[in-house]
């Protein structure tokens, strides 16, 4: 179980970039980058839903993750009425990240939109990349029944955890048969938090694919109750995942649902 990391700070403003800005000029490395992007986009649109025109980007991650961001996808290919919140670019050919931001300052307007961001960039020791993995080797999904802001707060927390704090979620999930995280802040209130179980995607969800630069797996974060959190500590994350999959909850997040243990 990961406790809430107080070193992770949230920047509340997001900005959007048109998808066309993701394209690059065509030298050898950039051709590979674009081929990975195109293959991943095709997989998402075949198995989840059409990607929006705009990608959400956290200002402090601009330079660290220039070709990545977060998508809010109407998940019609999974089930109408569902929304998939997803990282998009952890499996890019220029990942893992080799720099980290420090002394970030972001200015917002009255509507909470970003006006400007300044940061100092420092090189960091790169993560040893597996030859079989595409970038970090995974993308993170949260599936919900609503188009809301709180899942984006969670996605930003995930971005900070992976890109800045260098936490290898995939390795932890594989080592522990899943990963529970408690009290992740997803709103302005002190008690506006969620607990999640992070596990590999289970069928009938798409599990992953082989991209031109290696394997991509999907990790899915599912909101769980306090009771389920404590039960998983005693009985195992894999046991909780099985109970979720055997129930109507599966890997879909609903902050208002009752515990499956009742």
Where do the PLM segments sit?
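Bacterial N-terminal signal peptides that target proteins for export
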Residues: 2-11
